[in-house]
């Protein structure tokens, strides 16, 4: 893996790398610096979506979720961004025809929401919604 900051660095890296083929492609991702990362676990029955909550990672986006800590409720996000995260979560769960749990990871920078991952399954963060909460989030 290589992080590059300019077109020139990218071209240089590609030429120095092994030959790209269908079996060994070069994958390019945009790295969003100084962004906040959020985790959402939701439950969908195919018609309605229940969002257990939004967790904010303490570390900047880019730290693997298994190596990061998070807090509920999120502390560095506007109500408009929270609403957008909830809307995207519901739309994706319904469009993907999820029946059961779904986990989504988002990055937010300058109030712009980026979808990082969508996992049509439970995640390790799912239990965190029920542990500190007086309500049974996913019952």
Residue spans for each PLM region:
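Rossmann-like NAD(P)H-binding beta-loop-alpha module
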Residues: 1-2, 9, 31-48
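Conserved beta-strand positions that form and line the central face of beta-propeller blades
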Residues: 3, 27, 137
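ATP-dependent carboxylate/phosphate-activation module, predominantly the ATP-grasp catalytic core
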Residues: 5, 44-88, 122-131
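A long amphipathic alpha-helix within ATP-dependent nucleotide-binding catalytic cores
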Residues: 13-31, 42, 70-108
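Conserved metal-phosphate-binding beta-hairpin within the catalytic cores
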Residues: 28-30, 38-44, 52, 97-126
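Hydrophobic pocket-lining residues within nucleotide cofactor-binding pockets
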Residues: 32, 58, 134
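Single conserved hydrophobic/aromatic residue that forms the stacking wall/gate
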Residues: 129-139
